[in-house]
């Protein structure tokens, strides 16, 4: 069984888009720790949560696109985090930012305001005390820079 740092693994993932984002975050965390395990992580956590097909597919799409555009996402975050060296960004904060940017830039049909709110909630659940403010600040800077509608 996979365990996930920073949150309560026994807490069930809801069969919602929010739950799908949490699933994608957890799978990405495991992909960092054990490269090549993304699909197993997605399958295992989705099965444990009894998550519906459409939300599992959404989580998988988010995670795969996030990995596919990892370098570009890292560069965007690094450029926006003007007072932070990339090595100082907590692993989970970085993953939450990458996941949100994936949704903002590559997944159609989700309002930017919803994506940012969801990222802040993930940061509150899994990040440190100030993670939500950091995530909000970086996403705000990038959405303004990119001219994305909120």
Each predicted region: which residue ranges?
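N-terminal interaction/assembly modules
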Residues: 1-126, 130-150
């Amino acid at each position: 069984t996979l365990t996930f740092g920073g949150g309560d693994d026994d807490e069930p993932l809801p069969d919602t888009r929010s739950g799908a984002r949490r699933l994608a975050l957890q799978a990405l965390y495991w992909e960092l720790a054990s490269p090549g395990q993304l699909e197993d992580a997605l399958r295992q956590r989705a099965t444990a949560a009894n998550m519906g097909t459409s939300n599992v597919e959404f989580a998988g799409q988010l995670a795969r696109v996030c990995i596919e555009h990892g370098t570009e996402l890292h560069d965007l975050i690094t450029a926006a985090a003007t007072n932070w060296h990339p090595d100082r960004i907590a692993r989970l904060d970085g993953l939450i930012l990458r996941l949100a940017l994936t949704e903002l830039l590559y997944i159609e049909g989700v309002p930017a305001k919803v994506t940012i709110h969801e990222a802040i909630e993930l940061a509150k659940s899994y990040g440190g005390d100030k993670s939500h403010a950091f995530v909000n600040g970086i996403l705000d800077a990038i959405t303004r820079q990119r001219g994305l509608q909120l």
